[in-house]
């Protein structure tokens, strides 16, 4: 009796579970889903993306220069199967709706936004953060091999992508240059007027994306959370979806942050093939974390009229004061600055941030000017400000043209140029502040912290990666021309950043750089520059070889023995190599605590990179592969690194360093003090 009774009591539960399973199966067949919040929802997440305890899908968590992705875990079929008569498969219509919110740490600064994505793959590991929104990088942006359709909600302007404003919506295919874009907003169904919306309002808003397979049109519509879907879409673009994705594709979201911390949220999401997306129940949505403004007190209500009267009586004085201040902070603007305009700082803000460019804020001297530490008053972001004198060797306009291009560079091992300001005869450049200063003080300063071998090897690999980006991975070739330890800065976590592009040159791929005056730092200049005056990738490699010697040996490029004579550091290392004691050249302050194989590899690679003949030096991609252990180091031979070649280098540079034949006698005479 007890077992039949148990079965009878379990029948409703079994029936309920069966119906639930049938419903889930039907949803999978129909290619549709609805998430009114994400608590317990199965999504594929990577990067900073998480589901909060409250059910919010948080793509970025307020950390700078990171990315996050969230995808529906299973691929969806975007094509109807071919007919039995042998016809080809046809693309399907789809529709999605979602609720999003962006919470920026500072009301006056923002990071890139977020994007809804339809992609062949969920793997965006090679994509960059910042303006690339975690979807592409500088090398593959716009390539047809990317295979993605995205709708971006973008809160910064990038001249590189032709962005129209810092508050726009765009339809992107395989890259971040939008096929169609418009300012964020909606068309009011009652009046027909266009109503602007702020993506940074910290209020949730709705977006609908509809693809019509018959017309190949992608329509994007948005509205405040409390309004229904407007009849007129915000923007439309014709997209040949069959050329973008294949039979199956993933749907989800991508987001990234730049130098300003922001949080990007998705509160709800629905999707359907061959029909309108299911409605979202906005009453069930999790709360978006926002800053709630305080209501004005009764005291303010009483005092406000009195204060207004006092303000009117003070206007005459204020006009005079403002006029004087404007003359003090007067800035120069020209038409060419449109390309870099969104990154322009006001002189007043920089003046205040640096305490009037006071001496106590002076960090040091960089190429073309002094560098000051600053703190932006509103955001409290720490910055470094370089004042470039109008007496620089280059014309001001030519120099700024270089800055406009270099300002587009984005790499984790490059010091980020945040923006600029022009005021009378000065150009002010604003960079990320690096709290641990320059690398050279850790290599040469007395009583400084001694860098471990692991830190040194990571720094060498990081700078090699940045040079690879400059030489090979950006749209133009960038020659740094001044790679050295004092131009490598360290952030709070001792990560390295190559900076000071005051001498850099850019040129298009397939062309040669023009002959210029020989510039750079003695000890790092490739010997051929003395004759040709033409910088090249090989001359940057030479300087990088000397830089690696600096980091590994803890010595300056040009040494002085006890007799007052000079000796090239590369000569000293070469002599150690010939004697089979190359690792004896490693910084003695490490007291033998280093990876012998890594140190030997680096020192031998230094000799190759510092070869006096440009054609004998490896390219930067080969250097990176060697440092990563992806390829074996070529065997070094006496013929490859001969005394005559080193003497040739010294003769070309016209210096007084001793030739290689005298190295052996001088090694023991080099003092250990720095």
UniProtKB/Swiss-Prot annotation:
Positions of region (Legume-lectin like): 31-275
Topology relative to the membrane: Single-pass type I membrane protein
Positions annotated with a glycan in the UniProt record: 42, 61, 143, 196, 219, 240, 281
Subcellular location field: Cell membrane
InterPro entries for this protein: ConA-like_dom_sf, Kinase-like_dom_sf, L-type_Lectin-RKs, Lectin_legB_Mn/Ca_BS, Legume_lectin_dom, Prot_kinase_dom, Protein_kinase_ATP_BS, Ser/Thr_kinase_AS
Further remarks about this protein from its record: Plants silencing SIT1 exhibit increased tolerance to salt stress.
Name of the protein this chain belongs to: L-type lectin-domain containing receptor kinase SIT1
Gene, per the UniProt record: SIT1
């Amino acid at each position: 009796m007890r077992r039949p009774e148990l079965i009878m009591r379990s029948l409703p539960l079994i029936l309920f579970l069966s119906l639930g399973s049938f419903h889930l199966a039907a949803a999978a067949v129909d290619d549709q889903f609805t998430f009114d919040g994400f608590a317990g929802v199965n999504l594929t997440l990577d990067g900073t993306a998480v589901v909060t305890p409250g059910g919010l899908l948080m793509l970025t968590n307020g950390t700078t220069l990171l990315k996050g992705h969230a995808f529906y875990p299973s691929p969806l079929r975007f094509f109807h199967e071919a007919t039995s008569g042998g016809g080809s498969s046809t693309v399907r219509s789809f529709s999605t709706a979602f609720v999003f919110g962006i919470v920026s740490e500072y009301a006056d600064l923002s990071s890139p936004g977020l994007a809804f994505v339809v992609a062949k793959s969920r793997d965006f590991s090679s994509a960059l953060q910042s303006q690339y929104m975690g979807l592409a990088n500088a090398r593959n942006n716009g390539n047809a091999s990317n295979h993605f359709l995205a709708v971006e909600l973008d809160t910064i302007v990038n001249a590189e992508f032709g962005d129209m404003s810092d508050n726009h919506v765009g339809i992107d295919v395989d890259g971040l240059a939008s096929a169609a874009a418009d300012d964020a907003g909606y068309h009011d169904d009652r009046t027909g007027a266009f109503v602007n919306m702020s993506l940074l309002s910290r209020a949730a808003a709705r977006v609908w994306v509809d693809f019509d397979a018959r017309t190949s049109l992608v329509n994007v519509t948005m509205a405040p959370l409390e309004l229904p879907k407007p009849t007129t879409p915000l923007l439309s673009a014709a997209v040949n979806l069959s050329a973008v994705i294949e039979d199956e594709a993933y749907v989800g979201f991508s987001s990234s942050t730049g130098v300003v911390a922001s949080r990007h949220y998705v509160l709800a999401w629905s999707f359907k093939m061959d029909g309108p997306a299911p409605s979202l129940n906005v009453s069930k949505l999790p709360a978006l974390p926002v800053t709630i403004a305080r209501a004005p007190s009764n005291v303010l209500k009483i005092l406000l009229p009195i204060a207004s009267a006092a303000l009117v009586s003070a206007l005459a004085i204020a006009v005079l004061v403002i006029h004087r201040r404007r003359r003090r902070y007067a800035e120069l603007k020209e038409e060419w600055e449109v390309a870099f305009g969104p990154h322009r700082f006001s002189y007043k803000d920089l003046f205040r941030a640096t305490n009037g460019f006071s001496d106590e804020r002076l960090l040091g001297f960089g190429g073309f000017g002094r560098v000051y530490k600053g703190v932006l008053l509103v955001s409290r972001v720490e910055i470094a400000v370089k004042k470039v004198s109008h007496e620089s060797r280059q014309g001001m306009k030519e120099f700024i043209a270089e800055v406009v291009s270099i300002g587009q560079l984005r790499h984790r091992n490059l010091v980020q140029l945040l923006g600029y300001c022009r005021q009378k005869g000065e150009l002010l450049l604003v960079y990320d502040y690096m709290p641990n200063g320059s690398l050279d003080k850790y290599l040469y300063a007395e009583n400084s912290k001694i860098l471990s071998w692991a830190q040194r090897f990571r720094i060498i690999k990081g700078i090699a990666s940045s040079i690879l980006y400059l030489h090979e991975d950006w749209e133009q070739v960038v020659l740094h021309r001044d790679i050295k330890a004092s131009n490598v800065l360290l952030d709070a976590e001792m990560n390295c950043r190559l900076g000071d592009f005051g001498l850099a040159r850019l040129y298009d791929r397939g062309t040669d750089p023009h002959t210029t005056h020989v510039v750079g730092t003695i000890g790092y200049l490739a010997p051929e520059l003395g004759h040709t005056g033409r910088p090249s990738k090989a001359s940057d490699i030479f300087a990088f070889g000397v830089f690696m010697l600096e980091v590994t040996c803890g010595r300056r490029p040009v040494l002085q023995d006890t007799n007052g004579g000079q000796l090239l550091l590369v000569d000293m290392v070469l002599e150690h190599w010939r004697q089979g004691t190359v690792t004896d050249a490693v910084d003695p302050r490490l007291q033998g605590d280093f990876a012998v194989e890594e140190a030997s590899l680096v020192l031998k690679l230094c000799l190759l990179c510092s070869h006096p003949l440009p054609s004998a030096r490896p390219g930067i991609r080969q250097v990176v592969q060697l440092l990563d252990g992806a390829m074996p180091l070529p065997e070094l031979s006496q013929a490859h690194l001969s005394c005559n070649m080193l003497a040739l280098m010294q003769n070309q540079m016209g210096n007084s360093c001793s030739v290689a034949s005298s190295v052996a006698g001088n090694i023991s005479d080099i003092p250990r003090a720095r």
